[in-house]
Amino acid sequence: IANICQAIPDTNIDDIAATIGLDPRIGNLFLNAGPGYGGSCLPKDMNAIINLSSKIGVKPTLLNAVKKTNRLQISNIMTLIKHNIGKIQGKKITILGVAFKPNTDDVRDSMGIELVRKLVKLGANVTIHDPKALDNTRKIFHGNAKYTTTISSALKNCQCAIIMTQWKEYEKINNKTIKYMNKKFIIDSRRILSNKNLNAKYYAIGLGQKI
């Protein structure tokens, strides 16, 4: 539904989710569109149920579709990047947040890590910022990426910035923060900055472009 909203001008997935969540049988606790789910539990549990279903002769059609759709979110972000900055090789791209959720250093099955992996493979010069997860990220990418502890240094001279984790720190990003970006192009997978009038080309998952 978020991807549908993204294709329709002036449409916001958060409005749709809030309406759906009014139904007490559903609630709104987990209706948070983003770059895909990750972490140490949900992906593992999903795979376990799929494997069990296959072993006992039950075709897990819906579960396979959920897993495939989850992985497609990163592909959609990659498409946005390529469409706006062209060839990825040699471009400086900043990833803001690699922990699978805020307030943790856990990067297991993180969509941010998956995105970095794809960008590094294509030859991007990736700079990573995360308030807590940099040490665990270094163990994965070593010298294949750069790491920084400040948002301003992460954004300096970059041609694209992607917010992947909903850290409170990123809510403070403003026109002063992005002043020294080489190309002011931002992908906000969490819609953290959707209410700010940034002097930048801005895309957010689940948010249709303004007319």
Go through each PLM region and give its residues.
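Structural/interface elements that position substrates and couple domains in central-metabolism enzymes
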Residues: A2-I211
